[in-house]
Amino acid sequence: VSFNYTEFKDDGSLILQGDAKIWTDGRLAMPTDPLVNNPKTTRSAGRALYATPVPIWDSATGNVASFVTSFNFLFVIRELKYTPTDGLVFFLAPVGTEIPSGSTGGFLGIFDGSNGFNQFVAVEFDSYHNIWDPKSLRSSHVGIDVNSIMSLKAVNWNRVSGSLEKATIIYDSQTNILSVVMTSQNGQITTIYGTIDLKTVLPEKVSVGFSATTGNPEREKHDIYSWSFTSTLKEPEEQA
């Protein structure tokens, strides 16, 4: 599977859920835009998923896909006097996934705190330090999450509000290593990696996309300007 959005269009190739919108200038906004449209809205969640399911492993062969995805995005704080909340995630989840009930704020639109079973692999770009986050982390951090809002691994993220960020996420199925490289417009670079066997966590086909949330009141907007994704799953060898 391979696709590349240099700008976003409302052409049906993305499934929008909750408070998400594609603007005419080509950006994908989640939430729609608290700075302009919803100044009094509290606790919002929006998601955007690629409409075509992505094969991530093959039960017949045991082969697992490798993938690389890159995207440019922007966080803007509504008012500097407020603490920014809450963040953006790139995630893989079962086909048909919906926004869980009660998953706004720190649950980032992917985690249902009332349900003991959550199925996803995610990279979070979090702007708020919640009680489940390690004390060593500052408010802004990048984490790798597997079926839990408590990160498998996390590192501090030196971000600046209004700075364009570029994230590249690579999964190598030979080593099971998921690596993340963040490059900020201000020159800061953030890296993190973790080991995940996708076939033990996810079904054979998944949805891929983004989720973003705000807290109470909405204090931050998240805009995505471009997104590319390429996955490679080795085909079964033909019998002679």
Swiss-Prot record:
GO molecular function, one term: carbohydrate binding
Gene3D superfamilies found in the cross-reference section: 2.60.120.200
The keyword Chloroplast is annotated on this UniProt entry: no
Chain positions recorded as Ca(2+) binding sites: 126, 128, 130, 133
The keyword Cell cycle is annotated on this UniProt entry: no
InterPro entries xref list: ConA-like_dom_sf, L-lectin, Lectin_LegA_CS, Lectin_legB_Mn/Ca_BS, Legume_lectin_dom, Leguminous_Lectin
Keywords linked to the UniProt accession: Calcium, Glycoprotein, Lectin, Manganese, Metal-binding
Glycosylation sites: 4
Binding site for Mn(2+): 124, 126, 133, 141
Function: L-fucose specific lectin.
Family affiliation: Belongs to the leguminous lectin family.
UniProt-recorded name of the protein: Anti-H(O) lectin
Organism of provenance: Lotus tetragonolobus (Winged pea)
